[in-house]
Amino acid sequence: VLTHEDCELLQQTWEKVLGHQEDFGAEALERMFITYPQTKTYFPHFDLHHGSEQIRNHGRKVVNALGEAVKNMDHMSTASGELSNLHAYNLRVDPVNFKLLSECFEVVLAVHLKDQYTPDVHRAYDKFLSAVGDMLAEKYR
């Protein structure tokens, strides 16, 4: 469960993500494809090469959706219900992949936020991304 302190840390550090959504998102996706190559199966129509426009665009969408979740932490489920439906019913993404991408996004944050990615910030993002993954997986039940 996200505490008030967690929410404050997320909102403060998210300010540093703004303006870098496409870069951070693309980097997280590329890390996921390298580390967990089985995830590529969900993107058969994408050019999966480094710097691909499709990866950059999708990365931006992912990080922008996370930004909306940061803004709407109190009612994340209702704010992101459409995404949950899309991933469960249309794309049929195995929910374990949400955790894989979350791990890669946390690495990207650590690399770019450097000293500002403290253990408390790491804990807050871990809890937040887990909550987002749980919300996306709601429709699978």
Curated annotation (Swiss-Prot):
Its Gene Ontology molecular function terms? haptoglobin binding; heme binding; metal ion binding; organic acid binding; oxygen binding; oxygen carrier activity; peroxidase activity
Task: Tell me which InterPro entries the record gives.
Answer: Globin, Globin-like_sf, Globin/Proto, Hemoglobin_a-typ, Hemoglobin_oxygen_transport
Quote the Gene3D superfamilies the UniProt record gives.
Globins (1.10.490.10)
Q: Does Heme count among this protein's keywords?
A: yes
> Which domain of life, per UniProt?
Eukaryota
Q: How does it assemble?
A: There are three forms of hemoglobin in Sphenodon: A, A' and D. Hb A is a tetramer of two alpha-A and two beta-1, Hb A' is a tetramer of two alpha-a and two beta-2, Hb D is a tetramer of two alpha-D and two beta-2.
Name of protein: Hemoglobin subunit alpha-D
